[in-house]
Swiss-Prot record:
This is UDP-N-acetylmuramoylalanine--D-glutamate ligase. It comes from the Bacteria. ATP binds at G127, S128, N129, G130, K131, S132, T133. It is an enzyme of class 6 (ligase). Cell wall formation. Catalyzes the addition of glutamate to the nucleotide precursor UDP-N-acetylmuramoyl-L-alanine (UMA). One of its GO terms (cellular component) is cytoplasm. It catalyses: UDP-N-acetyl-alpha-D-muramoyl-L-alanine + D-glutamate + ATP = UDP-N-acetyl-alpha-D-muramoyl-L-alanyl-D-glutamate + ADP + phosphate + H(+). Gene3D superfamilies: Mur ligase, C-terminal domain, Mur-like, catalytic domain, NAD(P)-binding Rossmann-like Domain. It comes from Ruegeria pomeroyi (strain ATCC 700808 / DSM 15171 / DSS-3). The gene is murD.
């Protein structure tokens, strides 16, 4: 646990008692603060009360002037589309609003660090797609290389649940736009921006607000090293803003769309080969084509970002390649779940938006595509530019018929996962790939994308076993 600093003897309100909220309450108590907790869910309140925390109905009693700070969980809106009433009341009263990420950055360093020869480092990863894979890959590479490393944030443990830093250790954080937007302190040693595509726009007031939330990771004091994907205009702009000149190697530019040139530090992948150039000279290369845990160009982008971050931490190209080759991949992200009768079955349930689905569609051949769900802002028309390898779409979700009508490829309205899997498997031939890449949210039929992916895998396995 990371005891929170700066609030000893003070009251701190905690709104939301899920994984991060309850961990925050514990860390506040460990730092000498009194956590005043609230969640609309009675079971969550009961769990907190069972650990001895004070329950205060912040909806009715508000955030009083005896409160030093309000800590908000990521799912609670603090500005758009409208601030939660408790947050609005705190802002009106002048009470600072923060989250567990801000508390982590103000509390992670300890007095014992004065005796370390090699200080602990923090790598923070943000972006629209690829955050989890990039974060997990960095963690895996470092672990395989023998570095003490912890994985936290949106993946792994709650950020305040991790152990204090030890000499030479690394913490890898996956951070969403909700987290970077609100955190009052953001000071990673290495910051990674994977890419940007429309997502969560209602929570940020539009695309500009969404980019601004991501960009804060690079603006709050600035990291020692910035790894920035430059395949979108926002990333290219951010890299330019961070750089002091063409040869400034504080910024490592990353691309999978083109060969990068110039005197700076670049990592790019072309035709399945990763290349690193620094000061105009090649410094490393990896053949990514046969790395099973990283299929497709989108995973090559993740590989480039992870490679750059690990190089910034001092690892050799050889050590990084060894880690990549043993990387098993993450569930629900281009996850090969079965191969039978010459047909490959892939679970990419995490492809919850158009951009992520397009990247999955570009990674495989002869695709029987299971898609559909709750469409996100911006629609799905852009999918039609990436359907060259799609033999047929099998559409699920409550809006399956409307979804199918927008696709310029042969489609069948299946509605449910069991029907879609049954139809795709019945029609699949050797050499085909049955791919779940929904391009939509899951909440019309499932609690989350994980449950959707698990349903797909269960339906596939049931039929293979039968």
């Amino acid at each position: 646990m990371i005891p929170v600093k700066g609030f000893a003897g003070a009251n701190v309100a905690v709104l939301g008692l899920g994984r991060s909220g309850l961990a925050t309450a514990r860390a506040l108590r460990a730092g000498g603060a009194e956590a005043l907790c609230w969640d609309d869910n009675p079971a969550a309140r009961e769990a907190a009360e069972g650990e001895g925390f004070t329950i205060r109905d912040l909806r009715k009693q508000g955030v009083r002037d005896d409160t030093a700070c309000l800590i908000v969980s990521p799912g609670i809106p603090h500005l758009y589309p409208a601030p939660n009433p408790v947050v609005a009341a705190a802002l009106e009263a002048g009470v600072p609003v923060d989250n567990d990420i801000g508390l982590f950055f103000r509390s992670f360093a300890g007095p014992e660090w004065d005796g370390f020869d090699t200080l602990p480092r923090v790598v923070a990863v943000t972006g629209s797609n690829g955050k989890s894979t990039t974060s997990a890959l960095i963690h895996h590479i470092l672990s395989e290389a023998g570095r003490p490393v912890q994985l936290a944030g949106n993946i792994g443990r709650g950020v305040l649940d991790i152990e204090p830093g030890e000499e030479g250790s690394v913490v890898v954080l996956e951070l969403s736009s909700y987290q970077t937007d609100l955190a009052r302190a953001l000071t990673p040693d290495v910051a990674v921006f994977t890419n940007l595509s429309p997502d969560h726009l209602d929570r940020h007031g539009g695309m500009g607000g969404y980019f601004a939330a991501k960009r804060r990771l690079f603006a709050e004091g600035g990291p020692d090293r910035a790894v920035i994907g430059v395949d979108e205009s926002e990333g290219l702009y951010l890299a330019g803003q961070m750089s002091e000149g063409p040869g400034d190697d504080r910024v490592i530019r990353v691309s999978v769309s083109r060969k990068l040139t110039g005197p700076g530090w670049q990592v790019f992948a072309r035709k399945g080969y990763l290349s690193e150039y620094r000061k105009g000279r090649q410094a490393g290369s990896i053949d990514l084509r046969d790395i099973r845990g990283l299929p497709g160009a989108h995973n090559h982008q993740n590989a480039c970002a992870a490679y750059a971050a690990c190089r910034a931490l001092g690892l050799s190209p050889k050590a990084i390649e060894a880690g990549m080759r043993s990387y098993p991949g993450l569930p629900h992200r281009s996850q090969i779940v079965a191969e039978a009768g010459g047909v490959t079955y892939v679970n990419d349930s995490k492809a919850t938006n158009v951009d992520a689905a397009l990247k999955a569609l570009g990674a495989f051949k002869r695709i029987r595509w299971i898609c559909g769900g709750l469409q996100k802002e911006g629609g799905i028309a852009a999918l039609n530019g990436g359907l060259a390898e799609v033999l047929k779409a099998y559409v699920i979700g409550r809006e399956a018929a409307g979804f199918a009508l927008q696709l310029e490829v042969e489609s069948e309205v299946c509605t449910t996962m069991d029907e879609a899997v049954a139809r795709a498997m019945a029609e699949a031939e050797p050499g085909d790939t049955v791919l779940l890449a929904p391009a939509a949210a899951s909440f019309d039929q499932y609690d989350n994308f994980e449950r959707r992916g698990e349903d797909f895998m269960a339906e596939v396995q049931k039929r293979l076993d039968g």
